[in-house]
Amino acid sequence: MAECFAGGTATFLIMGNICTRDCLYCNVEHGKPVSIDEKEIHHLIGAVQKMKLEYVVVTSVTRDDLPDGGAQVFSQCVSKLRKALPACKIEVLIPDFQGNQAALEKVIAAKPYAINHNMEVVKPIFAQLRPQGNYDISLELLKNIGSSPVISKSGFMVGFGESREDILQLIDNLASVSCSRLTIGQYQQPTLKHWPVAKYYHPDEFAEFKEIAYQKGFQHVEAGPLVRSSYHAAKAIQGSRVK
């Protein structure tokens, strides 16, 4: 956290803290979400100004209860943040919008610096761990982002019981849809009620996956036990290769 703040970067959660989905690895509360707070955007702008941030990541819980999945809220956040802080770069980390292309277009039209959508897990166990999600829908979403002028980014965790071949297949799939930024991190079991950790990967294994991803054409890759989707976000968007 200190490393992020030192770099003028922070991540903000919008649209409440209750998710409409119940993934087996996630500790976010599941249930009926709260209504959208119309003042939230103003609070967000105020926080970014007070913290003097140079790079902001805006994310949300999944809001399947909203017609557009919250795309309009993301769009407004990007537009109003840019108007208030023209020099601040804005990345959005979005849900899948249930494959709603019109919803995604709202976010793309707002012209964030980058759009991130995390695949989270490999294909063979995706349906089991993310029963309300869909691997192909998420990949198609990233394909549509990759074909837009906005930078495309994704990430996933390892340690669920996947094979090396599963990991390489996911890297290949992401490369095939023009995803240019990638994060790979170690899954940590939030509570005993969640999916157990099957394996803790060695840093050398993460280094190998990182190099493979670069060979596949990714412009920036972060891979390591403590890496999460917003880690080194600003450096990643610059396209610098950090070893």
Give residue spans per PLM region.
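N-terminal pre-triad scaffold of radical SAM enzymes
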Residues: 1-29, 45-57
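Hydrophobic residues within beta-strands of alpha/beta enzymes
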Residues: 56-58, 90, 115-117, 182, ...
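Fe-S ferredoxin-like electron-transfer domains
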Residues: 34-42, 54, 70
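Conserved radical SAM core fold
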Residues: 57-67, 97-99, 113-132, 151-153, ...
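Auxiliary Fe-S-binding modules of radical SAM enzymes
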Residues: 1-8, 42, 46-52, 76-87, ...
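Glycine-rich tight-turn/loop motif centered on a GG-T
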Residues: 31-33, 63-72, 126-135, 194-203
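Active-site mouth loops of central-metabolism enzymes
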Residues: 13-14, 24-38, 91-100, 157-164, ...
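Phosphate/pyrophosphate-binding betaalpha-module
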Residues: 92, 108-110, 114
